[in-house]
Amino acid sequence: MKTRLTSFFLAAVLFAVASPARAQVQWDKVFNKLKLEVRADGEYTKADSALHPNLGFHGKYFNFMLGGDLGGGFSYYFKQRIVAEPGTVTFFDNTDFLYLDYMPTQNWRVRFGKDAMALGGFEYDASPIDVYFPTNLWRNIYCFQLAASGAYITDDGNHTFVAQVSNSPYVNYNGLNYDAGLVAYNLYWSGNIGHLHTLWSTSMVEYSWDHYLNMTMLGVKLVYDKWDWYVDFMHHALAFDDWGKNFGFVSCANYYFTPQFNIFVKGMYEQNKSDVTLGSSVSMDHQLAAGHTTARYGLGFEWFPSRDKNVRLHIYGCRMTDSFTDVDGAAKTIGSWNFNIGATWTMDFYKLFKK
């Protein structure tokens, strides 16, 4: 008990010194918002060992977003996935965001409610509807949690520091209730230094009572008029002797021929050479089951037919491999190809009503 009280005390102290910005980890000022956004894809996946591919059309995302100013420095934001798997823990499972934000000054903000865990990296920071062939960590981490956060924003707006205490995602993985007592402590820095942008975080994520997984996620991005390029590094460790065994990289570069048309290339590598897997589910270790190494790489393009960018068309193709040792001790590699074509569109009702 003393250990847990100490952890909460440290989190309270750190609450004053750290926060994120942009997209997923959002600390920009909330403006009036009333939107529906939709993404539908046609997908073709063929495993090397399969006789026939899996293919078809499906709805990827259908999101409702509502946000605005409540006065007196208070604002709110709500985002619900209308099409989603039924929740297994609470009604809030399919709610990405539902928080109250208070901004007493231009530099300080506090927030409470359903929010994204304050984790670094540009792939993680992007809204899910904008992510193509993601990493295993992105696929598996249960990142939307009830949380309390505090942020400090510099006068020029270029740096945001956040400290956050949230429910641990292992509450969801283990099928527990919110009062199971598992928590996560997250520290985050978002920085803009000329053309260089950063999204860095370090976290202690409780996976069982008083047992923690350390997560370090570091993202750097170069941004210019015609192109941008980011590299994210993700690292997990259960103990000091576990460092360097469970990590991954993901990198993506965009070239913008016009403001409405860009091509991108993306690649990633992830490995888990830890001695143990947390639980029976692959998702328990966020990235991979122990003993697995995966690589994924591909390219594609995006086209916005209109300048307001309310409609987006995309096409991409990628290759994935998974290397591991089977139960007989033999080294194996399995691979697959994935091709995807889709459309995303946004219905901005607030802008329509203003007109």
Protein language model regions, located:
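Bacterial N-terminal signal peptides that target proteins for export
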Residues: 1-9
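Bacterial N-terminal signal peptides
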Residues: 9-17
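Beta-barrel outer-membrane channel/assembly domains of diderm bacteria
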Residues: 21-110, 150-155, 161, 254, ...
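Surface-exposed coil loops of outer-membrane beta-barrel proteins
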Residues: 23, 41-50, 87, 91, ...
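Outer-membrane beta-barrel pore domains
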Residues: 41-43, 47-52, 88, 123, ...
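Short Gly/Pro-enriched turn/cap motifs at secondary-structure boundaries
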Residues: 54-55, 137-141, 289-290
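Exposed loop/turn and edge beta-strand positions of beta-sandwich/beta-sheet ligand-binding modules
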Residues: 60, 94, 106, 144, ...
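A generic beta-sheet turn/junction motif
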Residues: 71, 154-156, 191-195, 222-226
